[in-house]
């Protein structure tokens, strides 16, 4: 009689095709998951790096506008010493009034912020602000006029008088930065904790700690630990648009 057929490991096509299909899908899913795990941090880093570059470019534009204003007036835009328009963010309408900034080109917005996503941001004119004094609309205008950036609150002299922000181009003296949260402890627009600072001389610096290591000076607090105007010419606190000196 003929020998019995040798045992074969082959599986009938009816059984093997679905099995291979399921296995292929599992392998593809696992590969996609692994790629996501590996690439997601890189993608987030790339997004944050792009946002940082754009913020630094915006500070470059603002530095040029501020220096142009200072060249003409021998001081930087300074808020009134008192009154409803005595706000950090008044620098923006002041620069727009002299055609040094464009009201609606997004220079004052951090990419991805709520203001930038609204698509409606526009720096109000000084006349709009004056007309809004005494109305509920004023608070909305002063909160938004400075965009996503904060501005120096200047300093007061020994008698308590608010002083003009002089054009001395100091390389260690902040004039603008990312706007602080309302508690004045850190910036609000960068998830990583990054702070961008524009100094008087036009230099832009990135820091993760708003307290300067060399002298323990706080970016958003004066030497008395308050979010208010400085107590001497070397004291600087950066306030959000609506903050008063």
Specify the residue positions occupied by each region the protein language model found:
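Catalytic cores of eukaryotic secretory-pathway lumenal/extracellular enzymes that build
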Residues: 8-18, 33, 48-97
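Membrane-interface helical sensory segment of bacterial ECF anti-sigma factor regulators
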Residues: 3-55, 148, 157-159
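Conserved beta-strand->loop/alpha-helix structural units within folded catalytic cores of enzymes
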Residues: 41, 53-73, 100-101, 194-210
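Short low-polarity hydrophobic stretches
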Residues: 1-3, 174
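Active-site-flanking ligand-binding surface segments in enzyme catalytic domains
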Residues: 133-214
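Extracellular/periplasmic head regions of type IV pilus-like filament subunits
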Residues: 67, 71-133, 171-173, 192, ...
